[in-house]
């Protein structure tokens, strides 16, 4: 099978257009409905009662879930509405479930749930199949080994043959649209997530940073996200999560 450089030469020689499979997937996600709602249930948590809505991606079969907080009595159509507090969270088994100290993912999820409960209304979209910024669990563990050898989180992904971040947010945007979102305040430190959701027709009216505690284990990871990936971090070591949450208007 010809590889990309050979395909480029062939396309130029014969005057052909070349389209990557990833481009086709991105195009379809931007223009076709790729999610279908499969179930709705009440989910009591330590932060209060959420309504859990499951979705299936009809393109790749991945299941995703949205957690709604507020008074909608089981009817989630239009439950979110305008200018709502929203977190789009990529699955992180090691951080979310096993509380890995290598990253800040689990802390950010906890902070988002607590903040939504405190505000009284909001939504978390939990995107599965995005482990390790999209490279998968096995590759993420291999990246951990490379980090222990001295690479940072970006270098480790690249050494394994991946970009720094392979995620895209079309499915998350479609889930929010299905729930009736028209505008939102996005809980994120990642400008790519802000731009990604805006590119799918959602109006992001504000950015709410989530500053998790910086520790010996995650400091290099957070520094790399800030310096190489443009993530916005403004807290210092020792600041408690409850002290580190504030809201900003996005500058564009």
Question: Where in the sequence are the language-model features?
Answer:
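Catalytic domains of riboflavin
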Residues: 1-252
């Amino acid at each position: 099978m010809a590889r990309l450089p050979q395909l480029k030469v062939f396309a130029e020689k014969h005057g052909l257009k070349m389209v990557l499979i990833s481009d086709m997937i991105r195009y379809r996600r931007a223009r076709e409905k790729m999610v279908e709602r499969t179930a709705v249930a009440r989910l009591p948590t330590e932060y209060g009662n959420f309504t859990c809505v499951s979705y299936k991606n009809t393109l790749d079969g991945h299941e995703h879930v949205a957690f709604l907080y507020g008074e909608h009595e089981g009817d989630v159509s239009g439950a979110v509405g305008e200018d709502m507090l929203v977190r789009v969270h990529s699955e992180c088994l090691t951080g979310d479930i096993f509380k890995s100290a290598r990253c800040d993912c689990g802390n950010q999820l906890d902070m988002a749930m607590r903040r939504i409960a405190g505000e009284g209304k909001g939504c978390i979209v939990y995107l599965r199949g995005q482990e390790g910024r999209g490279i998968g669990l096995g590759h993420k563990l291999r990246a951990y080994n490379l980090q222990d050898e001295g690479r940072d989180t970006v270098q480790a992904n690249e050494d394994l043959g991946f970009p720094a971040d392979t995620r895209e947010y079309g499915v998350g945007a479609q889930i929010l649209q299905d729930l009736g979102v028209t505008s939102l305040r996005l809980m994120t430190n990642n400008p790519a997530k802000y731009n990604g959701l805006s590119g799918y027709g959602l109006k992001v009216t504000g950015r709410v940073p989530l500053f998790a505690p910086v520790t010996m284990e995650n400091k290099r990871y957070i520094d790399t996200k800030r310096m190489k990936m443009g993530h916005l971090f403004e807290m210092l070591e020792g600041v408690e999560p409850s002290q580190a949450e504030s809201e900003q208007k996005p500058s564009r």
